[in-house]
């Protein structure tokens, strides 16, 4: 599928974005391991989250829906999962794969995880190594680094794991495995990554302690089913925020967005660059901070990003690069080598595609340098099958002169079903 983008004057109005992808995944997984019923509202009906639902059903969990974002999970408890009769196909979802590995590590059965061609290229050893230290066994390609991967669960022992990378997926996999180990399991990271797993496990009744960059969980808890309303996904909202920021005269409000402090780096950066941003009606929803984000177009300035803020906006870097291309001055992004192992190598993908618009972009080993302020022209762009690349280049096209065409845009529903329709709600031609 191709997506055609024509330049627009500005964005105006109120919109909402689909439910948070990270929280939707975790709600299904933790709900399945709890006793009793978990009801989820505003569940993200994207392909990645549906892969999580499918895998848990394959292990005997009864799940009703999702219908209009509503889901009912009949939890089986920590010991209730059953050996799947077939391969567990996680599609394009790295989150499903890595978090499930943590759960499967503690099961008394063998399972095999596979995925699509893109996922089969993504590294898994960062997750399998600590899980092996806990007592699970793995057999996969490239020395247990690539899917397909067989997982032989077993009796797990707790560990104190020092992660070499700030990755919520690695941390969550170890914490989920820690549910099945008697005693305390801890994960220490070089910088704080998103904390949705800790918040959700705590809400379901697990004993979780957080101190600086270390999270500690007590094994074998009694998790109890609950009702969860998933906030809007700030990573999806980021595309609308940048679109408004780069189009002078824009003024939009995105309602009910998760503003978790481990995910709000995009707000900080856009403010730094000069965008008018206001958070209204801040509230707590199921343990997660939520607010309505108002953003106005402005003349943006270049900025520098590195260090601890990077894990707080790692998924937003492609769209931040678009903002930088339309800003005055130079933007430097460092310490972001994690981008190389996403759905595409997002460093080289961003460089290649922004250059097609006429932007001046330099590739670094761990980031980018973008010289902003040059007027951009519409282009024919590749998505690389990467949903965030497709949407970032679509936003770049809104402010460019001439038409932009995004090839392979059918990957967008992975995280943002209805992206084009939401955009149309606020476009002023």
From Swiss-Prot:
GO function terms (MF aspect): 3-phosphoshikimate 1-carboxyvinyltransferase activity
Where along the chain is the active site annotated? 315
Q: What is the main EC category here?
A: transferase
Question: What PROSITE patterns does UniProt report for this protein, alphabetically?
Answer: EPSP_SYNTHASE_1, EPSP_SYNTHASE_2
**Annotated residues for binding of 3-phosphoshikimate:** 21-22, 26, 167, 169, 315, 342
* Matches recorded under NCBIfam families: aroA (TIGR01356)
Supply the name of the protein. Answer: 3-phosphoshikimate 1-carboxyvinyltransferase
């Amino acid at each position: 599928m191709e997506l055609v983008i024509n330049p627009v004057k500005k964005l105006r109005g109120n919109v909402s974005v689909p439910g948070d992808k990270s929280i939707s995944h975790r709600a299904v997984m933790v709900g399945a391991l709890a006793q009793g019923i978990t009801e989820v509202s505003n569940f993200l009906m994207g392909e990645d989250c549906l892969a999580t639902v499918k895998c848990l059903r394959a292990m005997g969990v009864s799940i009703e829906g999702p219908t209009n974002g509503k889901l009912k999970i009949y939890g089986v408890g920590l010991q209730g999962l059953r050996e799947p009769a077939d391969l567990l196909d996680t599609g394009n979802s790295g989150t499903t794969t890595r978090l499930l590995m943590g759960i499967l590590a503690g099961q008394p059965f063998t399972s095999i995880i596979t995925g699509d061609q893109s996922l089969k290229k993504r590294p898994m050893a960062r997750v399998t190594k600590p899980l092996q230290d806990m007592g699970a066994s793995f057999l996969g390609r490239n020395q247990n680094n690539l899917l397909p991967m067989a997982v032989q669960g077993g009796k797990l022992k707790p560990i104190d794991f020092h992660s070499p990378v700030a990755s919520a997926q690695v941390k969550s996999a170890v914490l989920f495995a820690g549910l099945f180990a008697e005693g305390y399991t801890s994960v220490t990271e070089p910088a704080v990554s998103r904390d949705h797993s800790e918040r959700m496990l705590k809400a379901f009744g697990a004993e979780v302690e957080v101190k600086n960059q270390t999270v500690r969980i007590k094994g074998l808890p009694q998790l109890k089913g609950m009702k969860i309303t998933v906030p809007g996904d700030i990573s999806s909202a980021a595309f609308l925020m940048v679109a408004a920021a780069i189009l002078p005269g824009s003024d939009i409000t995105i309602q009910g967005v998760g503003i978790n402090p481990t995910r709000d780096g995009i707000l900080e950066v856009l403010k730094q660059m000069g965008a008018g941003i206001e958070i209204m009606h801040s509230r707590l929803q199921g343990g997660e901070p939520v607010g309505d984000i108002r953003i106005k177009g402005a003349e943006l300035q270049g900025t520098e990003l590195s260090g601890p803020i990077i894990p707080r906006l790692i998924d937003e870097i492609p769209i931040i690069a678009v903002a930088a291309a339309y800003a005055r001055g130079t933007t430097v992004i460092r310490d972001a080598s994690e981008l190389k192992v996403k759905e595409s190598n997002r460093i080289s993908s961003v460089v290649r595609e922004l250059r097609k618009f006429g932007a001046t972009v330099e590739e670094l080993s761990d980031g980018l340098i973008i010289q902003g302020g040059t007027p951009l022209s519409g282009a024919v762009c590749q998505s690389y099958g990467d949903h965030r690349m497709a949407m970032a280049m679509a936003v770049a096209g809104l402010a460019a002169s001439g038409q932009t065409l995004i090839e392979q845009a059918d990957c967008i529903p992975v995280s943002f079903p209805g992206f084009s329709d939401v955009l149309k709600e606020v476009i002023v031609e």
